[in-house]
Design a protein with these regions (language model features):
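Metal-dependent DNA phosphodiester-chemistry modules and their immediately adjacent helices/loops
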Residues: 46, 52-70, 219-233
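A short, charged helix-loop
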Residues: 52-79, 110-120
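Glycine-rich, often acidic, oxyanion-interacting loops/wings at catalytic, nucleic-acid
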Residues: 77-156
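Short alpha-helix plus adjacent loop in nuclease-associated cores
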Residues: 17, 24-65, 114, 201-212
């Protein structure tokens, strides 16, 4: 049984798992959809025909996606849940600043303007929501620490410069099994850090990163690389001797390129 790896395919996989003589395959929806889009007609019937064609012509090894275990899915969803809470905390902080910005201290008299009851209510409500969000983030991080306490892989990931408890937890459960990657280039491409390439005849041009795969993991890797650039700049020359020259590091665009290269 084959289906596109779209939203909601995990329950189907779990339901078919106990059945004997049944093989379930989830195919990359981005690639199968691109095949159907070339005809200009996108229907469920055409999608089913494309999936059948892929299976009959031996395209399963090329288009099949990894099927993570239930525990790995739940752990990575916890990392996604924490990320959403962090974004919510940022929005609340911005809202508090927007409300209180007009009630700053007078630079000439040193007096603070009196806030109305409405503004006081909004500020208190936002601060209460912010405090509650902080507690939720703390609970999520406690769960992550508890789940990673007995895992042998997470401490090894944290030995990498720039990788902390949050990065290592997300990496651990998104990768799950490192043996499914042939080399580091395939792992980098899995997280969208591979280089775009365009070749036609004798021309071959490389561009930016592909930005496919997990956005969260790619963001955490870039943040870890930024932390390493800020706290351990002397280590950059170990990875990129020419790019990390002192004169080049003055260019912000150049520094951003080094950060992405370090994340790869």
């Amino acid at each position: 049984i084959a289906c596109e790896a779209a939203f909601g395919w995990f329950p189907l996989r779990d339901a078919l798992a106990p059945l004997p003589d049944t093989t379930f395959v989830a195919l990359d929806a981005r690639k199968t959809s691109s095949w159907a889009a070339t005809s200009g007609i996108k229907t469920d019937k055409v999608d089913a025909q494309v999936l059948c064609h892929v299976c009959l012509q031996g395209g399963i090894p090329r288009l099949a996606v990894h099927q993570p275990s239930r525990h790995a899915r739940e752990c990575f969803k916890l990392a996604l849940h924490r990320e959403q809470l962090v974004r919510q905390r940022t929005r609340l902080k911005n809202q508090v600043q927007a409300v209180t910005r007009e009630y700053g201290i007078n630079p000439y008299t040193g007096e603070a303007p009196k806030k109305s009851d409405l503004v006081t209510f909004m500020e208190a409500d936002l601060l209460e929501a912010l405090s509650y969000t902080e507690e939720r983030i703390k609970r999520a991080e406690d769960w992550m620490a508890c789940l990673g306490k007995d895992d042998p892989v997470i401490p090894l990931l944290q030995t990498i410069p720039g990788i902390g408890p949050i990065n290592s937890f997300a990496l651990r459960w998104k990768i799950e099994t490192i043996d499914r990657f042939e080399d580091s280039a395939h792992l980098s491409s899995y997280f969208g850090l591979g280089i775009r390439e365009c070749q036609s005849g004798g021309m071959r041009r490389k561009g930016k990163i592909t930005k496919t795969g997990s956005t969260l993991v790619r963001k955490l890797l870039v943040q870890g690389a930024q932390a390493m650039c800020a706290k351990r700049p002397e280590n950059l020359s170990l990875y990129f001797p020419a790019l990390a020259a002192r004169g080049n590091m003055r260019d912000r665009t150049h520094v951003n390129k080094i950060v992405v290269a370090l994340a790869r």
